[in-house]
Amino acid sequence: MALFVIGLNHTTAPLALRERIAFAPSELNHALPELQNSLNDPDDTQANQPPAQLAVLSTCNRMEVYLSHAHEHKHPERAILQWLATYHDVPLSELTEHMYILQGESALNHAFAVASGMNSMVLGEPQILGQMKQAARIAFEANTMGSELRHWFEKSFAVAKDVRTNTAIGE
């Protein structure tokens, strides 16, 4: 499975754009399955390929789609960008100008930095870990969190705990 993070944050996008593409937690129960369906190829279902696994972290300072996808070569990041632009009625060109796309080890390292507060506007702020846990719970409830993505999130939570325990971050 290929791991991706597609998103924007306080360093890449102005507040006005972040507000336009933010999701309310209650909105994600419907939006996550819709996004998952847009990523799943009907041929994959027939070939017993696993569906895309995804979660969305949406806060005042960031919106990120965390994705575990079976087909690295199919460029799911393009489909996600198009879906986000359509869903939020934002021109694709405006959205892509401010988005980042991370894959593999870079995506995993980013998740570790976010969970531990190292990628926050205020270094070490503790709320982000709770927000990531909420994103994982919502994805689980929406049935878009599979074992691969769950493992990725659990590893991020463990790294965040280690960072808080073994460093002075957030003090």
What are these regions (language model features)?
Residues 1-120:
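A glycine-rich (often HGG/GG-containing) alpha/beta subdomain
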